[in-house]
Structures are given as structure tokens and as C-alpha cells.
Amino acid sequence: MVKTLVFLYLASESRLAFLEKEVQFHSLPREGEWLKLRNRDKGDYFAFRVQEVTHREGSLPEMMLDVLRSSETEYELFDEQELDEYIASYIAEEWLLKSCKENTRYKNHAHQRAD
């Protein structure tokens, strides 16, 4: 098993949440591959694309996951309540909420999720 430090972003139109967790894999996922993360409350319906993998000497590999996408150019955004629910559900899976700040990055390339 390969222990990896995984970074996950979840976004709404106004906020961007950054979560972190040590996750074990049978083999280290590579850039461009897709991951489904355990989420017992909300389900593991979403596949997150591995955006980058960084290897540090003397440390765990670090893996940055891409924000959910609806297409190659648009990002999926949660509504505000749904974002709070997903953050809470990942915290219940032992993810650490490192920050939640204003979303200035994905506003212009976003698609609001429709349920």
C-alpha cells in the first residue's frame, strides 16, 4: 500500500473549500487518472481527476485532485447548502478542512449543478 497526501477542492459560486487527507492506494495513481473517494454519507458518485502528483524527498507523495468538471472548459459548482453538506460528509470521512475562502478562481468557467 502507498500512503499519499491527497488535496481536494470543492467549490460553490461564492466559496472554495480545500480539504486534505492521507489516503492509501494499492499503487500510486498517476496524472490524468480518475479516483472515487469514499463518502458514506453522500456516496462515491463523483470521480475526481488526478491533476498532479508531487514526490518530495523524505515525505509522502502529494496528489492534487481537479475540481469537478462538467466539460473540458466548465467546472461543476455546488449550491451553498450542498457545499456545506459535502464538506461535512468528507470531514466525517476524516478529511481535514484546511480552508474555505472566496471563490475567485472558478467563477468564470463554472456550471451550476442541477439536481
Regions found by a protein language model. Give the residues of each.
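Short, basic/aromatic beta-hairpin or loop at an interaction surface
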Residues: 1-17
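Short alpha-helix capping/helix-loop boundary micro-motifs
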Residues: 18-25
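Short, well-ordered loop/turn sites that connect or cap secondary structure elements
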Residues: 28-30
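Short beta-strand-centered aromatic/proline hotspots
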Residues: 44-55
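Glycine- and charge-enriched low-complexity intrinsically disordered segments
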Residues: 60-115
